[in-house]
């Protein structure tokens, strides 16, 4: 787990990719859920993606069912929901665990030196966001209630726009 680009993740179709595919991009990595009170954030996340993708922003959504069982669907059902309801075109990945013994390696890496505002390394709820610079540095962890629009300035600074 030397750097973020060596991380291997599964796309929603279960094919493996390394995050090296996103080298030199600004990344916003989010654990997502379809039946959460914060699910509406998909719309604003897609808005950020539409506005900044050409400038180098990639959004990586990792469905997770660990918080109130709010992501019960299969990868196909999740993708259908996101595209039909929110017109999501950013990357959606395989459903994972973000806490506990079966935490996905990408989230072990993200949480390691980036505690929440309360000081916990655990992900506290759906829609926790990690902002990663073009050189792979984790810039900031944002809590679930941080609206995507509130991250806009940080994204613009990293993209130099």
Task: Give the ranges of each region predicted by the language model.
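Chalcogenol-based redox active-site neighborhoods
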Residues: 1-161
């Amino acid at each position: 787990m030397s750097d973020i680009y060596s991380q291997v993740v599964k796309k929603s179709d279960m094919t493996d990719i390394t995050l090296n595919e996103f080298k030199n991009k600004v990344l916003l990595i989010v654990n997502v859920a379809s039946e959460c009170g914060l699910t509406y954030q998909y719309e604003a996340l897609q808005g950020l993606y539409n506005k900044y993708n050409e400038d180098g922003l990639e959004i990586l959504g990792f469905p997770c069912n660990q918080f109130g069982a709010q992501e019960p669907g299969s990868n196909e059902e999740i993708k259908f929901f996101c595209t039909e309801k929110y017109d999501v075109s950013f990357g959606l990945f395989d459903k994972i665990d973000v806490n506990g013994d079966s935490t996905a390696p990408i989230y072990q890496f993200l949480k390691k030196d980036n505690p929440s505002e309360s000081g916990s390394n655990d992900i506290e709820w759906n829609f926790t966001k990690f902002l990663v610079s073009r050189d792979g540095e984790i810039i900031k962890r944002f809590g679930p209630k941080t609206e995507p629009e509130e991250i806009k300035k940080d994204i613009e600074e990293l993209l130099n726009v």
